[in-house]
Amino acid sequence: MQTLADLLNTIPAIDPAAMSRAQRHIDGLLKPVGSLGRLEALAIQLAGMPGLNGVPHVGKKAVLVMCADHGVWEEGVAISPKEVTAIQAENMTRGTTGVCVLAAQAGANVYVIDVGIDTAEPIPGLINMRVARGSGNIASAPAMSRHLAEKLLLDVICYTRELAKNGVTLFGVGDLGMANTTPAAAIVSTITGRAPEEVVGIGANLPTDKLANKIDVVRRAITLNQPNPQDGVDVLAKVGGFDLVGMAGVMLGAASCGLPVLLDGFLSYAAALAACQMSPAIKPYLIPSHLSAEKGARIALSHLGLEPYLNMEMRLGEGSGAALAMPIIEAACAIYNNMGELAASNIVLPGNTTSDLNS
């Protein structure tokens, strides 16, 4: 059986030759060079991903939502009852939540995965990959053992790879877990080196008078657990959560297949920071869907070197932003594959890099 280290070593590099060919192809399309802006850059990025074989395209689409509870909820860092995690996960199986509606609009399947919900029995309709009934309270103990973190990473990587074998070429990640912006902020603070007060936000409408406590909880968690910012697994195990581990696993699994993965919001940025510490080779496969309204979002994205495509003032999580951005990926593929070429037309644009065809 493959180990986590074995799988991390399988992540292929982006193909620069394929990207150069894509650049030449796009420059020859029926438009001024560069006039489709970031859509062009996105198409070129996709062309470099080995899993797409040099031609940007979208097959099946999947949003994987990692659901888990967090022991740190006990510290008063969230206003919603912990039971909401399980209730909302059940709602996802009925297709009535935000991510389900947006994914259906995008033609994507939603996979609701229990990686650590705190219920006595598994919830019917969920994919059961639970490793524990919620993580430890990071304010007083590690979130989990390194062994559990590595086990869940490996399980999710393998599951993601199976979906790829069955035709999924575009992945999105999502999260569900009460109080999970607290461990996410702890991860962002640890890896970026920024102070907790710079990255801790209100999450799911935490009253501002409770924000100081949340900041203190994050600071205590980091001081107590001493996560190594250079070791992504260590950070996830000490101050993360099972949903964050699961999202990192999707990113690593998709990248190991040479396929793109759409990030969602703040939770996914934190998971991406940890995943990139495990394997910097995954970064070109990460596509930032939107700018989360959560405090600390820009800090995390800046550290990742990513610029989101949308700014919708969203902070729902669930994978809602990833689902919303899927048509942008399809649009980039469409211009690459379906636009006409200048060489086959009567239009000549010598040295024209800025004007549009009507100027």
Curated annotation (Swiss-Prot):
Active-site annotation: E318
CDD domains in UniProt: DMB-PRT_CobT
Catalyzed reactions per annotation: 5,6-dimethylbenzimidazole + nicotinate beta-D-ribonucleotide = alpha-ribazole 5'-phosphate + nicotinate + H(+)
Enzyme Commission number(s) from the entry: 2.4.2.21
An example Gene Ontology molecular-function term: nicotinate-nucleotide-dimethylbenzimidazole phosphoribosyltransferase activity
Pathway(s) annotated for this protein in UniProt: Nucleoside biosynthesis; alpha-ribazole biosynthesis; alpha-ribazole from 5,6-dimethylbenzimidazole: step 1/2
UniProt record, GO biological process: cobalamin biosynthetic process
Keyword Glycosyltransferase: yes
Gene3D superfamilies: 1.10.1610.10, 3.40.50.10210
The entry's keywords: Cobalamin biosynthesis, Glycosyltransferase, Transferase
Domain of life, source organism: Bacteria
Assembly, per entry: Homodimer.
Family recorded in the similarity comment: Belongs to the CobT family.
Summary of the function given for this chain in its UniProt record: Catalyzes the synthesis of alpha-ribazole-5'-phosphate from nicotinate mononucleotide (NAMN) and 5,6-dimethylbenzimidazole (DMB).
Family matches, as PANTHER family: NICOTINATE-NUCLEOTIDE--DIMETHYLBENZIMIDAZOLE PHOSPHORIBOSYLTRANSFERASE
Entries under HAMAP family matching the protein: CobT
Protein name: Nicotinate-nucleotide--dimethylbenzimidazole phosphoribosyltransferase
Record gene name: cobT
